[in-house]
Amino acid sequence: MFRQEQPLAEGSFAPMGSLQPDAGNASWNGTEAPGGGARATPYSLQVTLTLVCLAGLLMLLTVFGNVLVIIAVFTSRALKAPQNLFLVSLASADILVATLVIPFSLANEVMGYWYFGKAWCEIYLALDVLFCTSSIVHLCAISLDRYWSITQAIEYNLKRTPRRIKAIIITVWVISAVISFPPLISIEKKGGGGGPQPAEPRCEINDQKWYVISSCIGSFFAPCLIMILVYVRIYQIAKRRTRVPPSRRGPDAVAAPPGGTERRPNGLGPERSAGPGGAEAEPLPTQLNGAPGEPAPAGPRDTDALDLEESSSSDHAERPPGPRRPERGPRGKGKARASQVKPGDSLPRRGPGATGIGTPAAGPGEERVGAAKASRWRGRQNREKRFTFVLAVVIGVFVVCWFPFFFTYTLTAVGCSVPRTLFKFFFWFGYCNSSLNPVIYTIFNHDFRRAFKKILCRGDRKRIV
């Protein structure tokens, strides 16, 4: 891992650690002044300054954006759903990349050799692989969480507590560590013979073929395959539910549950489907505002983990047949009541002859409750579609950023020659992903955008006062 500078075999690179200039490149190797003079740098002064400025900007944006994400999740009521802890952990990994990895990669790149000693070389390389692996395993866990919330509906949402989410996050980090730390245990020492030792130290991760292939599979390709399969399944479920005929989409029709069968409410009122004990089971359901079993606070809109962009009228844009114009005041009250429906509760059914067993006919106030609940369900269904889209964007951007590196790195293990400049570009392009998630949240997520504005403008308001 840490060795003195030697000519590299063709295709030998350092994964997610230091990318060294070509040992045979006359711009720096062999150009050291006789008698131990000053080392020549691999780049001109202008190129070096450009690289330092770009990498510095990348680090600042990564730290700033991801700190905002963490503050927003802990301070915004709309973002306190337990599953948003995944985003906090993911943002923490990106911050650690920007503070503990990128600065040393930059120094190693512009100096042309490893300056920081053997011990930190080993730590640096392990942390680099750890943080990158944890990012993609986090995305894999988020995808599985999303899939379970769709296929298991009420059962999984009741189990989705902060304690359970934290346990999953710990598991994610443990899996990432298991994948990342073997190079510290199995290190191939090279260049340690009795021959003369070149002056330039080199920090390079284990380049044995078995490790390159296994680390690429464990750190990237296997989690990617899981995410793709999960997302294909989510897409199939969503597509099947959108095929429900329009006549079946009213408040008295039930969208097909994940099992593929359809059920009609048994005197439950306008909710879309019936779960155990008469609880509402919505398509693509998600946890709202806090721990399962807690009533959602009454407010202008419902929120979801990573809730998506929506207009102020998203809950009103599509209304099912039935009472269409509940008054603003009663509607707000009815919405709060509807959000507190628990297993075992039931709502009266609208219309003549539609009362459930032992349930009196619905009055005007109860009809407003049913209409508000059905309208809220339609708005939530639309937000679910946008949620699926934004999660696909986050995962897609990660894959686009890191796939070129892992693909070319795998090619080097099987003996293919990859241009060193191209490999360096893919390496740094992967680091750019750490700064992009906050941008994605800002573009597609109303709650994050509102929380960011509140955080950033708070100081301005204080100065004005």
Swiss-Prot record:
The outcome of changing residue 427 to N is: 350-fold reduced affinity for alpha-2 antagonist yohimbine, 3000-fold increase for beta-antagonist alprenolol
Query: What PROSITE patterns does its record include?
Result: G_PROTEIN_RECEP_F1_1, G_PROTEIN_RECEP_F1_2
Indicate the family of this protein. Belongs to the G-protein coupled receptor 1 family. Adrenergic receptor subfamily. ADRA2A sub-subfamily.
Tell me which residues bear the S-palmitoyl cysteine lipid modification.
457
GO terms (BP aspect): actin cytoskeleton organization; adenylate cyclase-activating adrenergic receptor signaling pathway; adenylate cyclase-activating G protein-coupled receptor signaling pathway; adenylate cyclase-inhibiting adrenergic receptor signaling pathway; adenylate cyclase-inhibiting G protein-coupled receptor signaling pathway; adrenergic receptor signaling pathway; cellular response to hormone stimulus; DNA replication
Name of the protein in question: Alpha-2A adrenergic receptor
Q: Which InterPro entries match?
A: ADR_fam (IPR002233), ADRA2A_rcpt (IPR001946), GPCR_Rhodpsn (IPR000276), GPCR_Rhodpsn_7TM (IPR017452)
What gene name does this entry carry? ADRA2A
The answer, when asked if Transmembrane helix is one of the entry's keywords, is: yes
Per the UniProt record, the site (Implicated in ligand binding) maps to 128
| Protein keywords | Cell membrane, Disulfide bond, G-protein coupled receptor, Glycoprotein, Lipoprotein, Membrane, Methylation, Palmitate, Phosphoprotein, Receptor, Transducer, Transmembrane, Transmembrane helix
